[in-house]
Swiss-Prot record:
It comes from Homo sapiens. Key component of TNFSF11/RANKL- and TNF-induced osteoclastogenesis pathways, thereby mediates bone resorption in pathological bone loss conditions. Required for TNFSF11/RANKL-induced osteoclastogenesis via its interaction with TNFRSF11A/RANK, thereby facilitates the downsteam transcription of NFATC1 and activation of PLCG2. Facilitates recruitment of the transcriptional repressor PRDM1/BLIMP1 to the promoter of the anti-osteoclastogenesis gene IRF8, thereby resulting in transcription of osteoclast differentiation factors. May play a role in estrogen action. It holds the Pfam family NT-C2. It comes from the Eukaryota. Keywords: Cytoplasm, Membrane, Nucleus. Residues 227-254 have a biased composition (Polar residues). This is Early estrogen-induced gene 1 protein. InterPro entries: EEIG1/2-like, NT-C2. Residues 183-193 have a biased composition (Low complexity). Residues 173-315 are annotated as: Disordered.
Length: 384
């Protein structure tokens, strides 16, 4: 039984990419990283030395190595395998360095997961005297199984998800397609589509109550009794015991015309009734019907705007009582003016004449003979 307690051995081909370090608290400087395996191997390497630009350092350095891991034979859970990334800063022209911080990554969490991107905060070496900076290290880890049992378990991930403000997890789609469940209702609320039409409910009297929806035009209301779906009417007539088309046509007969209800009743499959006699007996045998509702507006905002406008027009306010009516003032001014033609014939046909010596005169028809003799010359003044 000793072989059952022996731990399982695994080998993984690991690809570690050192991407970048953001939020660096330095304006300038040269940074580099030292990476090494604390467990499962003796891999040690250094990255390139890069300058700080806009509080960010980008290495894009890729490391490839083999990592050994073990797992519990009873549970198959992989043991921790720590990989440390140490960030350092050059001093004295590269002759010395100072340790800024480090990040420990458990490679067992990434076993067999392909390529995974992870961002982690740097931890300070001396937590008492050195302030921990808020620099964020971004790495990419890819691990592929080389040898060992492919049936193993990875430890729970230590990564913490960051919730973005303004987004609710309940707004996610829970189902696909047009269903009538809660997922369908959430889909309708996201896409902005109309909810499904509600079916009419059955009253205690046995007649179906129509939902709060009407046709858009009076012509459709007039022809609705003629073009109603017989299958839908037959379903309602089987439940209530009364023809839906007959009830609709009888309610419209008072407003439009008298209709033969025996044809519609036989088409709907319900109780057929023939109406004969005067209108008085017809109203006695008919159940009380609600008058047809007015056409429903397209948008609720139009209804509220119309209701608000009607209420303002029907109820005069104090401002309307004290305000001067501009139309009345304009009408009063127009009535006080005299628009009759008071022009005299003597003032008409006036002309300006200028003689050769520079003298000018105004005259009417009397000076026309003198113009022809050449004493005066007419002057034409264009209107602008």
């Amino acid at each position: 039984m000793a072989f059952l307690m022996k731990k399982k051995k695994f080998k993984f081909q690991t690809t570690f990419t050192l991407e970048e370090l953001t939020a660096v608290p330095f304006v300038n400087g040269v940074l580099f990283c030292k990476v090494r395996l604390l467990d499962g191997g003796d891999f040690v390497s250094l990255s390139s030395r890069e300058e700080v630009q806009e509080n960010c350092v980008r290495w894009r350095k890729r490391f490839t190595f083999v990592c050994k891991m073990s797992a519990n034979p009873a549970t198959g859970l992989l043991d921790p395998c720590v990989f440390r990334v140490s960030v350092r800063k050059e001093l004295k022209g590269g002759k010395a360095y100072s340790k800024l911080g480090f990040a420990d990554l458990n490679l067992a969490e990434f076993a067999g997961s392909g390529s995974t991107v992870r961002c982690c905060l740097l931890e300070g070496y001396d937590t008492k005297n050195t302030r921990q900076d808020n620099s964020i290290l971004k790495v990419t880890i890819g691990m592929f199984l080389l040898s060992g049992d492919p049936c193993f378990k990875t430890p729970p991930s230590t990564a913490k998800s960051i919730s973005i403000p303004g987004q609710d997890s309940s707004l996610q789609l829970t189902c696909k397609g047009g269903g009538t469940s809660s997922g369908g209702s959430s889909t309708n609320s996201l896409t902005g589509s109309r909810p499904p039409k509600a079916r009419p409910t059955i009253l205690s009297s046995g007649l179906p109550e129509e939902p709060d929806q009407n046709l858009s035009s009076p012509e459709e209301v007039f022809h609705s009794g003629h073009s109603r779906n017989s299958s839908y009417a037959s379903q309602q007539s089987k439940i209530s015991g009364y023809s839906t088309e007959h009830s609709r046509s009888s309610s419209l007969s008072d407003l439009t015309h008298r209709r033969n209800t025996s044809t519609s009743s036989s088409a709907s499959g319900g109780l057929g009734m023939t109406v004969e006699g005067p209108e008085g007996s017809e109203r006695e045998h008919r159940p009380p019907e609600k008058p047809p509702r007015p056409p429903r507006p397209l948008h609720l905002s139009d209804r509220s705007f119309r209701r608000k406008k009607d209420s303002v027009e029907s109820h005069p306010t104090w401002v309307d009582d004290t305000r001067i009516d501009a139309d009345a003032i304009v009408e009063k001014i127009v009535q006080s003016q005299d628009f009759t033609d008071g022009s005299n014939t003597e003032d008409s046909n006036l002309r300006l004449f200028v003689s050769r010596d520079g003298s000018a005169t105004l005259s009417g028809i009397q000076l026309a003979t003198r113009v022809s003799s050449g004493v005066y010359e007419p002057v034409v003044i264009e209107s602008h």
